[in-house]
Amino acid sequence: MTSGFIIATLAIIVYSLWVRRDTWWTRWEVTATCAVAMEGCALLLMSPWAAPTVGVMLHQALGVWNVQQMLGHLCLIAAVSGNIYHMLVRLADPEQVKVLMRRQLMVPIWLGVAIMVPAFVLADQDYLPDFFSAPSANSLMIVYAVTGSAVVLYLSTYVSRLMLTLRQDPRAKTTIDLYLVSMGFAAAATTTVVASAWVEGDDAGPVIWACVCLSIGIFSYGSARSWRAKSAWFSPATAR
């Protein structure tokens, strides 16, 4: 079931990136497209498929197992940060956005990363094909899981507040509603990760994967829908 969720989500990501292919050169849209791409990278790195390939190569280079999982988690943090920037530039001047990002986002993000990376490395885990399906009671991994989840929840709350402001525009209402649902699944996934960090077993794995895939899939579809709606205004049919 997990593989089916991942494949379906990757298909939506590819669709979204194809729809948004022209936005790589659009100043106001490129960060949203980067966020979709980063979520795709995160999904691949966290997937059980990456463990016997990327995971083994990274272990040979660094001597630490499951590094690809940590990189996937960091990609998710980067994706949410990119989406926050995309929202902020619609509400404030770019120079003000830089100040806000530096003061309100970069500090908690870098503090979280400064805790997560050493905790992950020092935990000295064994090989795990699926990080979510084999939560560890290792105290350092609990620190890692709680810190990472706290960062994601903080960013999700921050971006949700921005979305509620942007939702006042009737043209953006449907897309913002999709984004809010996506953030809801993200919050559910991170909460389940924290809860499962203290429990031995693999019962939480399918729930976490379902929430992660639904969050990423809905966000990617919403991003594609948003750009199709915006680009329609410039089509010849609309111009007439």
Functional labels for PLM-detected ranges:
Residues L91-S156:
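Membrane-proximal helix-loop-helix units in multi-pass membrane proteins
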Residues M1-Q69, A172:
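Membrane-proximal first intracellular loop
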Residues A51-W65, Q125-L140, S196-P206:
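Membrane-interface interhelical loops and short amphipathic "cap" helices
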Residues W24-A37, L100-M106, R171-S182, A204-C211:
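Membrane-interfacial loop-to-transmembrane alpha-helix junctions, especially the N-terminal start
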Residues Y15-W18, Q68-M106:
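Internal transmembrane alpha-helix with an interfacial aromatic "cap," most often the third helix
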Residues L43-M46, A114-D124, A189-V194:
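C-terminal TM-helix exit segments that contain a strictly Trp-centered aromatic cap at the helix terminus
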Residues A150-R240:
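C-terminal transmembrane-bundle signature of multipass membrane proteins
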Residues F5-L10, L76-V80, I142-R161, L214-I218:
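Generic alpha-helical transmembrane segments
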